[in-house]
Amino acid sequence: MSDQQQPPVYKIALGIEYDGSKYYGWQRQNEVRSVQEKLEKALSQVANEPITVFCAGRTDAGVHGTGQVVHFETTALRKDAAWTLGVNANLPGDIAVRWVKAVPDDFHARFSATARRYRYIIYNHRLRPAVLSKGVTHFYEPLDAERMHRAAQCLLGENDFTSFRAVQCQSRTPWRNVMHINVTRHGPYVVVDIKANAFVHHMVRNIVGSLMEVGAHNQPESWIAELLAAKDRTLAAATAKAEGLYLVAVDYPDRYDLPKPPMGPLFLAD
């Protein structure tokens, strides 16, 4: 077949929401359930051809997403409703497409992204929750959210996050640029909201684990700055659990004009 006869290829971006509690992370792997595998299967059914997706951020086992962004290429010409309603009809109930947008050839869900934003939700109450048990992290000691917020501000800007980096992290550098980190209380919920150009492995969960020690008055406010300067993972607190973590937004250059739905998680005020 000559070049003139090749069918056109369309590049499509999707916004994806998922409850990660029953999945072994985003990335497709043999023998275990993954969000990527379920999404690719549903897309392939609608496109009537094999589809491979590329995501903005590969979340770990048990981690959720309300603002994940993916892209894929296909020769299938479909209406937007097919990529949203049609794909959702083929997805399990804990994964959903939130929006669809045709994108230019130079768009890449991962490499075009300029920042990622996560929210970590702590249910701070003496008694554990049931309904949201896989969507929040329970911490029974009273937490001082304002104290946590003050302690976290030393993490702003470009820093070496070795103290908050998983030992098995494969990133070439521990340096990341944190644009904001806010800790707020919403009734029994304490929310840690952090945005950075990118994250080293377990960075948010390791930061939150140490912030909870500060919030519970087990460590001074200055401890976070001391940990950052020490560049030693063994000095920081244990990694916070996966179930409280959400990828809530990914930033892209304005020229792509991607939709920006409410970030969520949707049981909280935006």
From Swiss-Prot:
Catalytic activity: uridine(38/39/40) in tRNA = pseudouridine(38/39/40) in tRNA
Chain spans, region Interaction with tRNA: 168-172
Active-site residue list: 60 (nucleophile)
Organism domain of life: Bacteria
Physiological role: Formation of pseudouridine at positions 38, 39 and 40 in the anticodon stem and loop of transfer RNAs.
Record-linked HAMAP family: TruA
Family: Belongs to the tRNA pseudouridine synthase TruA family.
Protein name per its UniProtKB record: tRNA pseudouridine synthase A
Organism: Escherichia coli O9:H4 (strain HS)
Name of the gene encoding the protein in the UniProt record: truA
